[in-house]
Structure formats: structure tokens, C-alpha cells
Amino acid sequence: MKKKTSLSEEDQALFRQLMTGTRKIKQDTIVHRPQRKKVTEVAPKRLLQEQADNSHYFSDEFQPLLNTEGSTKYVRADVSHFELKKLRRGDYSPELFLDLHGLTQQQAKQELGALIAACRREHVFCACVMHGHGKHILKQQTPLWLAQHPHIMAFHQAPKEYGGDAALLVLIEVEEWQPPELP
């Protein structure tokens, strides 16, 4: 770092003389944004509670009536069938991916609950759940579990680029996002 050269007394006096009669200019062109509050991390206990709250909807005894012909699909009664068509065409790109390969049914339920909680918390509308082929247990159970959850609007077999018949694209109902209020 360079040392500042100090001005001689003569130069300082000359500078003061030249600056007499001047006034400070008020800065009015740049508006500074107010300081935003730091976003606090969600407590781990709360994350576990959200995961448990979302996974308790999944029952192995209840079998929702799903269309077994053709590709795996479901649309909630209050949701437009056009949303299902958009899912099928790949109009929605998933922002979160969940891979259930190698998990037990209980672990898969917990992970599905965690995915739904994360999507709602992060305002993610579309996610991809990869259940794989395997022994077809998770492939059969995953759509049945998803159809039971109240925040699942629709799901459809994923297009080839997202896993084809070994994955599902899921539309999740998220709360309306509100921007933070400025002080």
C-alpha cells in the first residue's frame, strides 16, 4: 500500500482558497435499497416435523382408484386436466429431483414427505420422483402414496429425458408467495 503524500502548508492554503464559496452537492440520483433482514435457516427439528407431517398421509392399506391403463397418471378433482397434459408434454421442468432407488418402503415414504415439505417451503411447483424399475414395489406404491396427499395436484409418467416410465413428474400445490415487506 502506498503512503499518502502530505501536502505542504502552502498547497493546503491554496486548496482552501480555491474551494471557498463552494458547497456540497446533494446526491439525488441513486436510491439505496433498505437493508433486508437475513433469512434464518429452518431449524432441524422443524424440518423433521414437516417431513413427519407430510409422510403421515401415506397409507399402505388405502388404495386410491387410479387408471391402470396406459401411463401412470393422476389429477386431483379440483385441478384442470390441461395441467396433466402439460406434465405429459414436458411443459413443466422439475426443479427438485428425488431418487428412491435402493430405499425401503418406509424410507421412501419419509423421503416423499420431505420432498413435498421442501417444495412447499421453497415454492417449487414441479418435482421429479425417480422410483426405478427394480422389483416394482416402489413403482407400484409411489403413485398410490402420492394420490393420497392433499398437496399433490397431479402427477404423470415422466418424459424420457426425466426418467421415462421409471419416474413421475409431480405438481405440488404451493402457498401463494408474498414478497417480504419493506420497513
Swiss-Prot record:
PROSITE patterns noted in UniProt: SMR
SUPFAM superfamilies referenced in this protein's UniProt entry, alphabetically: SMR domain-like (SSF160443)
Protein family membership: Belongs to the SmrB family.
PANTHER family: DNA ENDONUCLEASE SMRA-RELATED (PTHR35562), UPF0115 PROTEIN YFCN (PTHR35562:SF1)
Residues in coiled coil: none
Gene3D superfamilies: 3.30.1370.110
Superkingdom: Bacteria
Protein name: Ribosome rescue factor SmrB
Keyword flag Hydrolase: yes
Span of domain Smr: 98-173
GO biological process annotation, one example: rescue of stalled ribosome
